[in-house]
């Protein structure tokens, strides 16, 4: 007689629960609608772990937050609240540069970038560069070549609260010579 072993598994899923409220805490700079528009889970939905994780991922991908902790809190037998505890991070950037080249002379510039401008999820970028070089000609005259440029860019990722990105930029460049 051969040995045998029968194994029976009894799998029982828990009761389905509905999402009662979505609560967002910890956002002092970012407007709540900027976060809510990334959600895949909504009040009244049957709770889905997959949708909760997708919402977490999409909020994280904004890159405005240092930490995001989603919490599920039971409220009664068949409802839950979903709480997103958010820690914002500084998202503005500044850059400065200086350099010298025998061909182009001295150059310098700087700029600022605000990826969450005024907490609305918009992008504002401003930069300025200036260059100065000396050249000597055979007639012993010295001339200076000056160049400067200015750029400003703005993007709105949700035009009229729809996921349509619109943006524009203005670029100005000036080159000249003095004797």
Name these PLM-found stretches:
Residues 48-179:
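Gram-negative/organellar outer-membrane beta-barrel architecture
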Residues 1-74, 90-92:
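Acidic, glycine-rich low-complexity/disordered segments
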């Amino acid at each position: 007689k051969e040995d045998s072993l029968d194994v029976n598994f009894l799998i029982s899923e828990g009761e389905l629960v509905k999402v009662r409220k979505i609560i967002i805490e910890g956002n002092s700079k970012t407007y709540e609608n900027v976060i809510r528009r990334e959600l895949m889970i909504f009040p009244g939905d049957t709770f889905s772990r997959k949708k909760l994780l997708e919402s977490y991922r999409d909020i994280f991908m904004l890159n405005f937050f240092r930490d995001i902790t989603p919490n599920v809190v039971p409220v009664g037998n068949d409802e839950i609240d979903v709480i997103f505890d958010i820690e914002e991070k500084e998202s503005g950037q500044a850059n400065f540069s200086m350099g010298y080249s025998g061909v182009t002379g001295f150059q310098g510039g700087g700029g600022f970038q605000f990826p969450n401008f005024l907490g609305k999820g918009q992008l504002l970028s401003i930069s300025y560069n200036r260059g100065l070089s000396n050249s000597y000609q055979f007639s012993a005259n010295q001339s200076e070549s000056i160049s400067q440029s200015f750029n400003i860019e703005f993007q709105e990722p949700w035009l009229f609260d729809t996921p349509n990105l619109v943006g524009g930029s203005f670029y100005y460049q000036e080159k000249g010579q003095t004797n």
